[in-house]
């Protein structure tokens, strides 16, 4: 039994979100949430919300045993980028790219 949750258009760069995702991939759900709670990264809070959403989906749909769930798949894909301008000296301007992410979490039973 698999449970999925997707967070789309999240305002964090995929590179920074993948640092956190690599830590919890393959962990049990309880251990992953505890690890993310004490991790001092912006991506940890975001990933924790998506994992908790997948956990809620698992309990809502199939009445799955929460104790046996683990993080089977976490994928961080790039979303659309926001283009901004930063003024510089002598009337110039440089571009800034604010990246977004699509986060997919799949939970499965052992």
Curated annotation (Swiss-Prot):
GO terms for biological process, alphabetical: translation
Keywords annotated in UniProt: Ribonucleoprotein, Ribosomal protein, RNA-binding, rRNA-binding
Keyword Hydrolase: no
One Pfam family this sequence matches: Ribosomal_L22
A GO cellular component annotation in the UniProt record: cytosolic large ribosomal subunit
Protein's UniProt keywords contain rRNA-binding: yes
GO MF term (any one): rRNA binding
InterPro entries: Ribosomal_uL22, Ribosomal_uL22_bac/chlpt-type, Ribosomal_uL22_bac/org-type, Ribosomal_uL22_CS, Ribosomal_uL22_sf
Subunit structure: Part of the 50S ribosomal subunit.
Classification via PANTHER family: CHLOROPLAST 50S RIBOSOMAL PROTEIN L22-RELATED (PTHR13501), LARGE RIBOSOMAL SUBUNIT PROTEIN UL22M (PTHR13501:SF8)
Family the UniProt entry places it in: Belongs to the universal ribosomal protein uL22 family.
Chain's role: This protein binds specifically to 23S rRNA; its binding is stimulated by other ribosomal proteins, e.g. L4, L17, and L20. It is important during the early stages of 50S assembly. It makes multiple contacts with different domains of the 23S rRNA in the assembled 50S subunit and ribosome. The globular domain of the protein is located near the polypeptide exit tunnel on the outside of the subunit, while an extended beta-hairpin is found that lines the wall of the exit tunnel in the center of the 70S ribosome.
HAMAP family named among the record's database cross-references: Ribosomal_uL22_B
Official protein name in the record: Large ribosomal subunit protein uL22
């Amino acid at each position: 039994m698999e449970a999925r949750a997707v967070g789309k258009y999240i305002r964090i760069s995929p590179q920074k979100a993948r640092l956190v995702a690599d830590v919890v991939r393959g962990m049990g759900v309880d251990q992953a949430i505890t690890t993310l709670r004490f991790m001092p990264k912006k991506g940890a809070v975001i990933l924790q919300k998506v994992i908790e959403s997948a956990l809620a989906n698992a309990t809502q749909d199939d009445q799955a045993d929460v104790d046996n769930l683990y993080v089977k798949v976490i994928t961080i894909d790039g979303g659309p980028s926001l283009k901004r301008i930063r003024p510089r000296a002598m009337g110039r301007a440089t571009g800034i790219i604010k990246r977004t992410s699509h986060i997919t979490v799949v939970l499965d039973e052992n």
